[in-house]
Amino acid sequence: MRRTGGLRLLSAVAAITAVASAAACGGSSARSDDGPTRRGSAAARTTPSPTPTPDPVAALVRRMSTADKVGQLFIPTVQGTTAATGAAMVAKYHPGGVIYFPNNLRTARQTATLSNGLQRAAAKDDGVPLLIGTDEEQGIVSRLPYITRFPTNKALASTKNPDDDVRTAARVTGEELRAVGINQDFAPVADVNVNPRNPVIGVRSFGADPKEVAHLVGVAVDAYRATGIVATVKHFPGHGDTATDSHTGLPVIKHSMATWERLDAPPFQTAIAHHIDMIMTAHIVVPGLDDSGDPATMSKTVLTGLLRDKLGYDGVVVTDSLSMAGATMKYGAPEAAVRAVRAGADMLLMPPRLDSAYRAVLTAVRSGRIPQSRLDQAVTRILRMKQDRGILRSPYVDASRAADIVGSAEHRAAARKVAAHVRAGR
């Protein structure tokens, strides 16, 4: 696979950022102690034109090959507990990110070493640093076996001071993820769980009241972002009223547009107002929003018409796992990946076969089925997010300090306090 024609991507970013800093400081080496300018002089009346500030992300996108841009769209799994196997995959496909599961994770130091190894693989030939993510919602969805544990979102929402407890759980979780080199969390859940028989959301949700869920989503997003973590709310347009698990089937939610606006939309609107980094799509069909029968993940009406145009979101959209039945029942995995990008998704999570999904998207770009402008738009969003969250600048962590942060006395005390609040609130 081609890299970038020999152009040094991250070196270019560093150089352009330095130029931008110089421009912000005046962009001139002229002396500032030459004495005051006389009142009424031409110099006093003339304001020099500001030096345009270069955009390092735009410069980086221009320097990338089409193959490397397509790689940025993917978030595959990695194998093993060391970087050896994952590094080969990163070197071949140059993905935008990877996702960890328990089979990758043994101890805090081991995970930090794994993360650093994968970031070194991504940096070869001046490649782009990785998003390294996981599903650490706490409660019943927790991937790190050694993390400081907190109750479910539903339990946190039940305490007398849910704001404080949600904030504490997100802060501690974010700090521990960052310590082991995980810079992105697929959390918090923004679904309003109004169906008691919901087999997939349930206690992962903050509850059934859209206003309360929206408020606590905002609290969690702020707390995650304060730790430097890329937060991801899920599952748009709302997975809270289903009796079908999208891992094994394709749910149909019979909400009208009016019901969606009242019930499902508020948590996502709040997340957007709180500058959420990423929004994950749902593999669900909502005929009241799009009567095509396509899953929301592959619906331009939902991802572009509702999320982008109606709600005004311009951040990164990531699909839920493309290995799920809800994503593949109608079109198959490679075609699902192409249709998701065409609909407005920027990143593609966990295709069942990375090679075939990658080839399908690359072929679609080269044929024009996915316009180059759509690819560049997605990659620009991804890189800008990485720049804004410091991932382009500083992707590595100090593995020797990971065990001091994860499960620290302060974190364990905070978790015990929250657990006591949950017990007292019931």
Where are these regions (language model features)?
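A substrate-binding/cap region within the structured catalytic cores of diverse enzymes
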Residues: 155-182, 189-221, 225, 405-412
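A short aromatic-anchored loop/beta-hairpin motif
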Residues: 95-105, 287
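A non-catalytic, amphipathic alpha-helix used as a structural packing/dimerization or gating element
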Residues: 168, 172, 215, 219, ...
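Second-shell residues forming the walls of enzyme active-site clefts
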Residues: 65, 85, 106-123, 208-374
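Preference for extracellular/luminal or secreted protein segments
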Residues: 2-19, 25-93, 329-426
